[in-house]
Curated annotation (Swiss-Prot):
Organism placement in taxonomy: Eukaryota, Metazoa, Ecdysozoa, Arthropoda, Hexapoda
GO biological process: DNA transposition
Location of the protein in the cell: Virion
Entry keyword Cell inner membrane: no
Ranges of biased composition (kind: Basic and acidic residues): 320-331
UniProt region (Disordered), positions on chain: 258-333, 350-417
Disulfide bond annotation, renumbered to this chain: none
Biased composition (Polar residues): 287-298, 407-417
Keywords, sorted A to Z: Transposable element, Virion
Domain of life of the organism encoding this protein: Eukaryota
Protein name: Retrovirus-related Gag polyprotein from transposon opus
Biased composition (Low complexity): 308-319
Chief place of localization: virion
Annotated Gene Ontology cellular component terms: nucleus
C-alpha cells in the first residue's frame, strides 16, 4: 500500500509540474498578444499596407494583358497643368475602381502601367525625381497631389465662392469660374473621412450656394429674369442666361431704322483681346501728366540768304548791312521818311556855252566828258539823295532822260530851285 501511495504522489507531482509549465506558456503567449494588439491599435486603420501587384508569368496572362480596355486607351494625357489635375485624377481613379476586383491579376498591373504612361511633361519629371515606382498607384497619387492639388482649405474656398461676381467677364467665363470653384469644394469634401450621408448633405448645400452666387453675381438684366425663373441647378441657370442673352443681342445686331440708344450690355462671346494700356506710375509725377498740355513755343526761324544773282555787289550793299545788323528793312512805299525825291519843283537852266576846242583837243575833251557823265549816272542810281550844306537836296536824276540835249556840250546841266 505504501508503495502504491508513493507512486501516486509522484505522478501527481509530475502532473502538477506539467500544469505549471503550461500556465507559464499561456501567460507568455497572452503577454505577446497584448503587445501586438497595442501596436496594431496605435497604427492608422485607414492606411492599408501596399501590396505588390502580380506580374504575368504564363503565356495566357501575357495574352490577356495585351488587350487593354478602351476606357484606359482613351484616357487623356496629364502634362502638369494645375487646372486639369482634378478632372484627370478623378477619371483615372474611377477606371481603377471599376477593375478593383482583379487587383490580384496581371491585367490590373497592366492598366496601372498604361495610366502611368499618360503622365508626361513636368508631372513625369516630378515622379522621376521622387523615385516613384510605375506600378505603385497610391504613391503616384501622393506625389501628384503634393505638386498640383489645391492647398486651400474648405473655409477659404467657401469665402472666395461667396465673393465672386461677373464684372467685366463674359458669361461663359463667369460660369466656368463658379463651376470650377464648386468642383474644388466638392473634391475637398470627398477627401474627408465623413459619413456618406453627411458628405451628400454638404454637397447639396454647396451646390445651392453656388447657384445663388451665380444668380446674384450675373448681370442685372439676367439676374432679374433668373429670380423669376428660379432654376434648380447651376447648368439650368447658365443655359437660360445664354438663351436670354442671345435673344436680347438681336435688337442691336439686326437692321433697325428706329433711333435707339446704346446697348445695355455687350453681346455674347465678346471679350477684350488685349488689356488696356496704362501708363506706369511715377512717384514724382502728379495724377495726370502735364506734358501733353504744355503750350509749345514757336519754332526757331530759319535765316534765308539773299539772292545776289540779279544785282551787283555795290547795289546790294545796303541790304547786306541791314541783314548783319538785325534791322528789318521796310519798303520805300510804306516808309514816308525815305521816299524818293521828286523833281517837280525844279526847272532846268540852260548850261553856259563853252569855247569850242580845235583839233585833237576837241575830241579828247568830249571823251573825258562822256567818262565823267557815266560815272555820275552810276553814282546817282546807286546812292540815296543827300543834303548839302545849304539844305538843298541833291536828288538822283537820270542824265540820259533829263539832260539828253546837253550831252554834246562840255558843261553839265544846272538845276535851280
Amino acid at each position: 500500500m505504501e508503495e502504491t501511495l508513493r507512486a501516486l504522489s509522484e505522478s501527481l507531482n509530475a502532473l502538477t509540474n506539467v500544469v505549471t509549465g503550461i500556465k507559464e506558456d499561456i501567460k507568455k503567449n497572452n503577454d505577446r498578444l497584448a503587445i501586438l494588439e497595442q501596436e496594431r491599435g496605435n497604427a492608422d486603420p485607414t492606411v492599408d499596407q501596399p501590396q505588390p501587384l502580380v506580374r504575368a508569368r504564363t503565356e495566357y496572362e501575357l495574352r490577356e494583358i495585351s488587350v487593354l480596355p478602351d476606357c484606359v486607351k482613351e484616357l487623356q494625357a496629364f502634362e502638369g497643368r494645375q487646372e486639369a489635375y482634378l478632372s484627370w485624377i478623378n477619371r483615372a481613379q474611377s477606371i481603377l475602381t471599376e477593375y478593383d476586383l482583379i487587383k490580384t491579376r496581371p491585367l490590373y498591373r497592366a492598366i496601372v502601367l498604361h495610366i502611368r504612361q499618360k503622365i508626361r511633361g513636368h508631372a513625369d519629371m516630378a515622379l522621376a525625381a521622387y523615385g516613384v515606382q510605375d506600378d505603385d498607384w497610391d504613391d503616384i497619387k501622393r506625389v501628384l497631389a503634393l505638386h498640383y492639388a489645391d492647398k486651400r482649405d474648405l473655409r477659404t474656398l467657401e469665402h472666395e465662392l461667396g465673393a465672386m461676381c461677373q464684372g467685366s467677364r463674359p458669361l461663359d467665363r463667369f460660369y466656368m469660374d463658379v463651376n470650377g470653384h464648386l468642383s474644388l469644394i466638392l473634391n475637398n469634401l470627398k477627401a474627408r473621412n465623413h459619413p456618406r450621408e453627411v458628405v451628400n448633405a454638404l454637397i447639396e448645400t454647396y451646390r445651392d450656394k453656388a447657384l445663388d452666387v451665380f444668380i446674384r453675381g450675373v448681370g442685372r438684366d439676367c439676374s432679374k429674369h433668373l429670380l423669376v425663373r428660379s432654376p434648380k441647378n447651376l447648368p439650368e441657370a447658365y443655359s437660360f442666361c445664354m438663351g436670354l442673352q442671345n435673344v436680347m443681342s438681336r435688337n442691336f445686331t439686326a437692321q433697325n431704322y428706329q433711333p435707339s440708344g446704346a446697348p445695355r450690355f455687350a453681346g455674347p462671346y465678346q471679350h477684350q483681346a488685349r488689356p488696356p494700356f496704362r501708363t506706369p506710375f511715377s512717384p514724382g509725377s502728379g495724377r495726370f501728366s502735364q506734358n501733353s498740355y504744355r503750350t509749345q513755343g514757336p519754332r526757331q526761324a530759319i535765316k534765308m540768304e539773299s539772292n545776289r544773282s540779279g544785282q551787283s555787289y555795290q547795289s546790294g550793299y545796303s541790304g547786306r548791312q541791314e541783314e548783319g545788323s538785325g534791322i528789318k528793312r521796310m519798303s520805300e512805299g510804306n516808309n514816308p521818311f525815305q521816299k524818293a525825291q521828286r523833281l517837280y519843283h525844279m526847272e532846268l537852266a540852260p548850261p553856259p556855252l563853252a569855247p569850242a576846242a580845235s583839233g585833237d583837243n576837241q575830241g579828247r575833251s568830249h571823251e573825258g566828258y562822256y567818262d565823267d557823265e557815266s560815272q555820275a549816272v552810276e553814282r546817282s542810281n546807286n546812292y540815296p539823295p543827300q543834303k548839302n550844306v545849304e539844305g538843298v537836296t541833291d536828288a538822283p536824276h537820270n542824265l540820259e532822260t533829263e539832260g539828253g540835249a546837253n550831252f554834246m556840250t562840255n558843261a553839265s546841266p544846272v538845276y535851280r530851285t
